[in-house]
Amino acid sequence: MQKIVRNRLIKIIICFCSACLGISIILYNLEKNIIFFFPPSKINEAEQGKELRVGGLVKRDSINKISANKISFVITDNIKDLEILYQGVLPALFREGQGIIAIGQLSDSKFIARQLLAKHDENYRPPS
């Protein structure tokens, strides 16, 4: 009888340790996705040298077209501003006052974006 209880206890402990290990691996791999994006005022909390997502509203009168497909603009969270440099095709919803998420790296005081995601507003309008 003692041997059966001991074997069952060992199996339970192995299952528990396996579950803990699996959950730890999942959380470790999801670490960079737990915070979807940083606002400009919290960008200093982000880990430097890694790819980041930063989000905010495109500040009015800040869009500066440098060349045919290179642009700079400023995003804000109404606390702090951050200059974004982007080279590529702009999303269709990109405009002043619109929310965006930029994916890239922080370089000095500028953010070099490799991808832009334009956020739409939360108001639903059915097609007419």
From Swiss-Prot:
Q: How does it sit in the membrane?
A: Single-pass type II membrane protein
Going by the entry's taxonomy, the superkingdom of the source organism is recorded as Bacteria
- The residues on the Cytoplasmic side of the membrane are 1-8
HAMAP family in alphabetical order: CcmE
**Classification via InterPro entries:** CcmE, CcmE-like_sf, NA-bd_OB-fold
GO cellular component term of the entry, any = plasma membrane
Q: Which residues bind heme?
A: 120, 124
Indicate what this protein is called per its UniProt record: Cytochrome c-type biogenesis protein CcmE
Q: Which residue spans traverse the membrane?
A: 9-29
SUPFAM superfamilies in alphabetical order: Heme chaperone CcmE
Q: What does this protein do?
A: Heme chaperone required for the biogenesis of c-type cytochromes. Transiently binds heme delivered by CcmC and transfers the heme to apo-cytochromes in a process facilitated by CcmF and CcmH.
Periplasmic-facing ranges? 30-128
Sorted alphabetically, the keyword list is: Cell inner membrane, Cell membrane, Cytochrome c-type biogenesis, Heme, Iron, Membrane, Metal-binding, Signal-anchor, Transmembrane, Transmembrane helix
